[in-house]
Amino acid sequence: MTLARYVYTPDPQEGTLLTPVNNSTAIRWFIDNLPINRVGMDEFTRGLEIGMAHGYWLIGPFALLGPLRNTELGLVAGLVSTIGLLLISTIGLSGYASLVEDVPTEFDRKGWSRLAGGFLVGGVGGAIFAFAILQFFPLVSAIARIP
């Protein structure tokens, strides 16, 4: 899957979306190496990697900016909220896979289902990993300061 297929067309009536930012070699390399665009990956592995990243970074805003941020349960509430959002996102991915008629040729319905399953497993795993890091950070920090 190449970026140019989506942003460039030779027909001047349709226009071109190529800019120095999205057409540079570094940006193309970055976009081509994102898990959704990487060639040769299994759908479950692709979803697992995407889910881990989302679960890992979603817990922070929920835990630190949520309504329970100043309580003892702020981090747990952030974890539960993150898992809830990941479940909603997985339901959305599964709904897309089963309801849309024109699925891209890279994924069939089974591939989208496997991607959604990997997204959920990876997302929950990433959220639990981030929760553990945030929960035990004071302990690790105290151990590191011991002379």
Curated annotation (Swiss-Prot):
Pfam families xrefs: PsaL
PANTHER family: PHOTOSYSTEM I REACTION CENTER SUBUNIT XI, CHLOROPLASTIC (PTHR34803:SF2)
UniProt topology in membrane: Multi-pass membrane protein
Chain segments annotated as transmembrane: 73-95, 115-137
Cell compartment(s), UniProt: Cell inner membrane
InterPro entries, A to Z: PSI_PsaL, PSI_PsaL_sf, PSI_suXI
Annotated source species: Gloeobacter violaceus (strain ATCC 29082 / PCC 7421)
Family label: Belongs to the PsaL family.
Keywords: Cell inner membrane, Cell membrane, Membrane, Photosynthesis, Photosystem I, Transmembrane, Transmembrane helix
Gene Ontology, cellular component aspect: photosystem I reaction center; plasma membrane
Subunit structure: The G.violaceus PSI reaction center is composed of one copy each of PsaA,B,C,D,E,F,L,M and Z, and forms trimeric complexes.
Chief location bin: membrane
Protein name: Photosystem I reaction center subunit XI
Any one GO BP annotation for this protein: photosynthesis
